[in-house]
């Protein structure tokens, strides 16, 4: 009898928190929160990358995109899942620095090459970080909506 009382009490106390978690997830999806919902154009661009790029190409992309790309493509990213990226805080800071680059474009391209970056994904997430001076120096490879995939030219 005491067991049943404890079981019912535990269920009664845990049910509201479970409902809150489910409701907040559904609310985020309904609002189109970019942390949970992938834009159709970004999804198409990701599919194109998976279909056309050579395995293990290094891509510079924003934090959310960098978290998703390796899950759907064979590409590698500068900064991906924070718990699976060694020195994640340093790489995220580098990513923000690169997308906010306002110095000489040639120095930015050199930095990308030194890091081994072959492609840059530049879409709404990356645009919100910055408008790097080196973007016009890249070669456009593919475009879907506002999303663009650029190749870092060889010197």
Residues covered by each model-derived region:
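Extracytoplasmic
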Residues: 3-155
């Amino acid at each position: 009898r005491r067991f049943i009382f404890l079981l019912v009490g535990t269920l009664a106390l845990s049910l509201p928190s479970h409902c809150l978690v489910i409701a907040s997830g559904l609310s985020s999806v309904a609002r189109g929160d970019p942390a949970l919902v992938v834009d159709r154009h970004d999804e198409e661009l990701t599919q194109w990358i998976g279909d056309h790029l050579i395995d293990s190409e290094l891509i510079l992309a924003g934090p959310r995109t960098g978290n998703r790309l390796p899950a759907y493509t064979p590409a590698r990213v500068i900064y991906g899942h924070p718990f699976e990226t060694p020195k994640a805080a340093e790489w995220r800071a580098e990513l923000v620095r690169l997308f906010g680059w306002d110095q000489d474009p040639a120095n930015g391209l050199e930095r990308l090459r030194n890091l081994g970056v072959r492609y840059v994904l530049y879409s709404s997430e990356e645009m919100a970080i910055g408008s790097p001076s080196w973007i016009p120096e890249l070669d456009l490879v593919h475009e879907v909506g506002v999303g663009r995939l650029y190749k870092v030219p060889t010197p």
